[in-house]
Amino acid sequence: MKKIAVDAMGGDYAPQAIVEGVNQALSDFSDIEVQLYGDEAKIKQYLTATERVSIIHTDEKIDSDDEPTRAIRNKKNASMVLAAKAVKDGEADAVLSAGNTGALLAAGFFIVGRIKNIDRPGLMSTLPTVDGKGFDMLDLGANAENTAQHLHQYAVLGSFYAKNVRGIAQPRVGLLNNGTESSKGDPLRKETYELLAADESLNFIGNVEARDLMNGVADVVVADGFTGNAVLKSIEGTAMGIMGLLKTAITGGGLRAKLGALLLKDSLSGLKKQLNYSDVGGAVLFGVKAPVVKTHGSSDAKAVYSTIRQIRTMLETDVVAQTAREFSGE
């Protein structure tokens, strides 16, 4: 039985969206058990599942504007902290939250703990591509500064995840840079390029540019945390902007535009689905001793369900334990 500790109070629509996603996951997956951490009375308003689910009551939660490290240290009984402690103590196999990203990263670092020989765990997510296959990118903001050695580790971690969780036999690994030539980039990118090119265990395809990411140029894209987070926000903003422009053009374009939209309804729905994070799952803090997964703060029940499905796959493939063995040399 796979045990998942869920912060029921994190996110814009908690606890309703969280609990409704849990209800659906428990209905579809008979091999998972969920521990819900949060306000019992509020959780029970939405909980319909009766088997393989438990509620651990707490009145305390971490707010979106709390300073991450201070919140983890001072709010000992916060729903997120208790969920992370359950993983540390072996009472759960993974933790999920839609709450404060920085606080969850701190909980992953300081409570769950790093895998031996991994210097800086990175935040990784599967982002959309036009062919629907997606690509894994890290670091998406767990670390503001990185060394070439960190980026090399991210390449290994991302490749490992793509193989074991996404089923890609030889993941193409690309280094995000300001040009595709091997001579491009600042000293960090140049040093990283040399490390990746020398690692025969990686299917390194060289530098990749941001404009090509959504065309599926690589299966794994490596970046420092600052750049990766900026790219992530740009992709999110562009997706929302495109959908907003289409909506404005349709609603303000008169009868012809509305008729055209009706004829293109299926195509537009497909586009919206491709750009939607709800089906993808959450961002994984990769490099800690158990799956620590952050789903989007504005996640609905569908996104929570998809993230639980993602965690289930991670536990099923034992990717974290395999990663630990790989890096510890055991």
Swiss-Prot record:
It catalyses: a fatty acyl-[ACP] + phosphate = an acyl phosphate + holo-[ACP]. It comes from the Bacteria. Its EC number is 2.3.1.274. The keyword S-adenosyl-L-methionine does not apply. It is an enzyme of class 2 (transferase). One of its GO terms (cellular component) is cytoplasm. Signal peptide: none annotated. Gene3D superfamilies: Isopropylmalate Dehydrogenase. GO terms for biological process: fatty acid biosynthetic process; phospholipid biosynthetic process. It is found in: Cytoplasm. Pathway: Lipid metabolism; phospholipid metabolism. The keyword Acyltransferase does not apply. It holds the Pfam family FA_synthesis. One of its GO terms (molecular function) is phosphate:acyl-[acyl carrier protein] acyltransferase activity. Keywords: Cytoplasm, Lipid biosynthesis, Lipid metabolism, Phospholipid biosynthesis, Phospholipid metabolism, Transferase. Catalyzes the reversible formation of acyl-phosphate (acyl-PO(4)) from acyl-[acyl-carrier-protein] (acyl-ACP). This enzyme utilizes acyl-ACP as fatty acyl donor, but not acyl-CoA. Belongs to the PlsX family. Homodimer. Probably interacts with PlsY. PANTHER family: FATTY ACID/PHOSPHOLIPID SYNTHESIS PROTEIN PLSX, PHOSPHATE ACYLTRANSFERASE. This is Phosphate acyltransferase. It comes from Streptococcus pneumoniae serotype 4 (strain ATCC BAA-334 / TIGR4). The lineage of its organism: Bacteria, Bacillati, Bacillota, Bacilli, Lactobacillales.
